[in-house]
């Protein structure tokens, strides 16, 4: 068989989940940039595909090799934001970057990308998977749903390519200046996340998909210069734990010159200290605000700055050198990529703070109060220029300070509560404890009716009404409370349900408002136009169980013929 060289086309440089031929007027008829042109395949022009793409219609297992592709066409480029969740898919409401709004082979949210300065975590949540190409290691990941991979940033910043059913996106690594100063964000990246549907924010790179994107290093250097030369940002001295401010403004220098002429400042001191050193706040800030510490605040700042001439530490110098000439030091690449499956991820519930945490916090605050009192007595004897960090204090309105004798009683109460958590409290005890804080029945009934009327369903289940009650109130007690209201008000009706659902959770009752039984005309006129009518079939719960169908005995043809004749 002779195949002309004109019909032989080179394959795509990147393995892709190529879509099949378009069905008539189906959602596969559109493709980005119209890069797919189909011709009638000749005999022997089929290419074997060991992993064919998912399709919703019948198609041959091997696509035609005559499918023309444009591997060198411009590809959409998305710059990832550091420490942000970037979503890619079909939905323009949920995703930061939209691949296609027509092709339903793409899920609403198909990929979730979380990126840092040196790592990129790509998770596939689409129904038919996707392909990630890491060109630095020349590896291709065929990801299925709920698969997750971790990519390490290479030295050349080569960007991975995300391929979802033929729609390719170049995932750019975050810029180095993004973590330093988030206020000076690039306007192009900001608009890119604001308008995921518009084609203008997406940078079209006239390069091969395997080559890294061109970066504007001048903009990154400008961001660094703006951050390091900003005079309004205070710098933290790690050793002395004090705030260090930049040199004073021209107004302060003019005041110093005026004081020098008056003779309040010696010329020898000013000649030695032509450049003012950072000033430090005194220990007693109340005297400073009232003006009793020193009548001349400017002179006090000058004296303190002259006395603390050599206070700058080596840690501050190191921090300044890092901020002025900060460069990214890439991490050595690993030979094999890190692959994480969802099954191996252990989900740990968040721990809630108990009474023991409150007791430890009280002990900590009491200890700090004693240390503060001792520090205040010593500070009155000898003035100290350093500012000590103050621990957060708990207000008396939130937590009452107790004596050490009361801690034993609190611990005993804590043990009793842990033992009693296994069994639900009785309704009588709970009602007695919350009688003072409980709302009147009329107000509670009005809130419940509002929830029922404005609900999206005709009948509302009990868990949807639990937010109207205290958070620590069990659902069983909420159901008893609602049944008490239903006994007093007949228009507040219940659909009783029994048994459990597929997860083994109990099926709670459903509630609805029946305006036909309500005698209050004003309430009926207010609620009837807004609510959805409840059919009679919905007012009785039907529990359905799956049962294996019974096989009917097949009769012979003679017997069936006899029945037809008879």
UniProtKB/Swiss-Prot annotation:
It is found in: Nucleus. Residues 373-383, 414-428 have a biased composition (Polar residues). Keywords: Nucleus, Phosphoprotein, Transcription, Transcription regulation. Residues 314-330 have a biased composition (Acidic residues). Induction: Transcriptionally regulated in a cell cycle-dependent manner by the mlu1 cell-cycle box binding factor (MBF) complex independently of sep1 and ace2. Strongly up-regulated in cells arrested in S phase by hydroxyurea. One of its GO terms (cellular component) is chromatin. Residues 1-32, 191-217, 269-291, 312-334, 364-437 are annotated as: Disordered. PROSITE patterns: FHA_DOMAIN (PS50006). GO terms for molecular function: chromatin binding. GO terms for biological process: DNA damage response; negative regulation of DNA-templated transcription. The modification Phosphoserine is found at residues 73, 379, 382. Its main location: nucleus. Residues 86-137 form the FHA domain. Probable transcriptional regulatory protein Required for G1/S progression. Belongs to the PLM2/TOS4 family. This is Transcription factor P14E8.02. It comes from Schizosaccharomyces pombe (strain 972 / ATCC 24843) (Fission yeast).
């Amino acid at each position: 068989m002779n195949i002309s060289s004109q019909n032989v086309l080179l394959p795509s440089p990147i393995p892709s989940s190529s879509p099949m031929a378009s069905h008539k007027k189906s959602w596969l008829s559109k493709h980005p940039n119209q890069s797919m042109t189909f011709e009638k395949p000749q005999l022997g022009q089929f290419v074997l595909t060991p992993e064919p793409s998912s399709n919703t219609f019948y198609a041959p297992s091997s696509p035609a090799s005559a499918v023309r592709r444009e591997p060198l066409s411009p590809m959409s480029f998305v710059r990832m934001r550091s420490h942000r969740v970037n979503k890619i898919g079909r939905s323009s409401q949920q995703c930061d970057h939209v691949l296609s709004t027509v092709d339903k082979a793409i899920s609403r949210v198909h990929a979730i990308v979380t990126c840092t300065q040196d790592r990129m975590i790509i998770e596939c949540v689409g129904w038919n998977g996707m392909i990630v190409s890491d060109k630095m290691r020349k590896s291709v990941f065929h990801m299925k749903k709920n698969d997750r991979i971790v990519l390490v940033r290479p030295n050349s910043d080569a960007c991975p390519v995300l391929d979802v059913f033929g729609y390719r996106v170049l995932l750019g690594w975050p810029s180095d200046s993004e973590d330093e100063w988030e206020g000076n964000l690039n306007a192009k990246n900001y608009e890119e996340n604001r308008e995921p549907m518009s084609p203008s924010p997406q940078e079209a790179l006239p390069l091969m998909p395997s080559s890294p994107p061109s970066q504007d290093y001048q903009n990154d250097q400008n961001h660094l210069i703006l951050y390091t030369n900003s005079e309004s940002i205070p710098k933290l001295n790690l050793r002395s734990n004090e705030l260090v401010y930049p040199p004073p403004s021209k107004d302060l220098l003019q005041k110093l010159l005026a004081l020098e002429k008056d003779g309040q400042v010696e010329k020898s001191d000013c000649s030695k200290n032509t450049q003012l050193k950072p000033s430090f706040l005194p220990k007693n800030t109340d005297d400073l605000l009232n003006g009793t510490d020193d009548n001349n605040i400017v002179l006090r700042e000058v004296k303190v700055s002259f006395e603390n001439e050599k206070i700058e530490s080596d840690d501050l110098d190191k921090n300044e050198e890092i901020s002025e000439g900060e460069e990214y030091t890439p991490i050595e690449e690993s030979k094999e990529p890190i692959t994480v499956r969802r099954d191996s991820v252990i989900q740990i519930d968040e721990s809630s703070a108990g009474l023991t945490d409150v007791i430890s916090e009280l002990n900590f605050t009491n200890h700090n109060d004693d240390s503060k009192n001792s520090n205040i007595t010593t500070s009155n004897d000898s003035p100290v220029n350093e500012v000590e960090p103050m621990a957060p204090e708990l207000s008396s309105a939130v937590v009452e300070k107790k004596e050490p004798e009361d801690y034993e009683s609190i611990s005993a109460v804590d043990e009793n509560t842990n033992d009693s958590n296994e069994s639900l409290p009785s309704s009588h005890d709970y009602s007695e404890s919350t009688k003072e804080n409980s709302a009147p029945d009329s107000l509670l009934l009005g809130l419940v009716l509002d929830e029922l009327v404005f609900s999206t369903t005709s009948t509302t289940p009990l868990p949807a009404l639990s937010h109207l009650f205290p958070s620590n109130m069990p659902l069983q007690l909420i159901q008893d409370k609602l049944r008490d209201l239903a006994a007093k008000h007949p228009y507040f009706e219940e659909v009783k349900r029994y048994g459990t659902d597929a997860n083994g959770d109990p099926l709670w009752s459903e509630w609805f408002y029946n305006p036909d039984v309500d005698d209050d005309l004003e309430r009926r006129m207010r609620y009837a136009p807004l609510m959805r009518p409840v059919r009679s079939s919905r007012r009785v719960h039907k529990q359905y169980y799956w049962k294996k169908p019974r096989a009917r005995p097949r009769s012979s043809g003679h017997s069936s013929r006899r029945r037809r004749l008879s």
